Amino acid sequence: MDISYNKLFKLLIDRGLKKTEFAKQVGIGGNTLAKLSKNETVSMDSVVRICRYLKCDVGDIMEILPADDDQQ
């Protein structure tokens, strides 16, 4: 499954939030922040924390991309 967190980082830019300060306020660690930056999977707990902090829905911070074999 390919995931993109580009929406999250655009939202952070739009709100003037720095990644490291955001992670600290949300309560996610540096490893989770690195995974988000690399579009790797993170725990649902982390996703929920982010959404609650930003007062948004899951679809506002991430999207699931079609797998290469799904694109026919």
Residues covered by each model-derived region:
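Short alpha-helical "recognition helix" segments of helix-turn-helix
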Residues: 22-23
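Short, charged recognition helix plus adjacent turn
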Residues: 2, 10, 63-72
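A short, Lys/Arg-rich alpha-helix, primarily the initiator
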Residues: 1-18
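DNA major-groove recognition helix of helix-turn-helix
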Residues: 37, 54, 65
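Recognition helix of helix-turn-helix/homeodomain-like DNA-binding domains
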Residues: 28-42
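Short, basic-rich loop-to-helix N-cap that marks the start of a DNA-contacting helix
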Residues: 39-52
